[in-house]
Amino acid sequence: MTNAALLLGEGFTLMFLGMGFVLAFLFLLIFAIRGMSAAVNRFFPEPAPAPKAAPAAAAPVVDDFTRLKPVIAAAIHHHHRLNA
């Protein structure tokens, strides 16, 4: 085996070992973050939402078409009057 092939083999070995250690560290980091999140949620849960107060008697809801019907009629009348 030549010196270049030996160096190439050692380079691949070192590369795969480095990638393996990084992958193992990332998995460890993921599990640590999940564990800390579970611990925080267990000891400090989010408060229950406060019940909403009943709304006061509101004015009756009028849809947009009912409010705009006289405006549309006036616009049509004005258009017919100008173009007649």
From Swiss-Prot:
Cofactor(s) listed: Na(+)
Subcellular location: Cell membrane
Entry keyword annotation includes Transport: yes
Signal peptide region: none
Its EC number(s): 7.2.4.2
GO MF annotation terms: decarboxylation-driven active transmembrane transporter activity; oxaloacetate decarboxylase activity; sodium ion transmembrane transporter activity
Topology with respect to the bilayer: Single-pass membrane protein
Segments traversing the membrane: 13-33
GO biological process: sodium ion export across plasma membrane
This protein's UniProt keywords: Cell membrane, Ion transport, Membrane, Sodium, Sodium transport, Translocase, Transmembrane, Transmembrane helix, Transport
GO-annotated cellular components: plasma membrane
Primary localisation category: membrane
Keyword Isomerase: no
Reaction catalysed by this enzyme: oxaloacetate + 2 Na(+)(in) + H(+) = pyruvate + 2 Na(+)(out) + CO2
Main EC class the enzyme belongs to: translocase
InterPro entries per record: Na_pump_deCOase, OadG
Role, per record: Catalyzes the decarboxylation of oxaloacetate coupled to Na(+) translocation.
Family: Belongs to the OadG family.
HAMAP family with a match to the protein in the record: OadG
Binding partners and assembly: Heterotrimer of an alpha, a beta and a gamma subunit.
Name recorded for this polypeptide: Oxaloacetate decarboxylase gamma chain 2
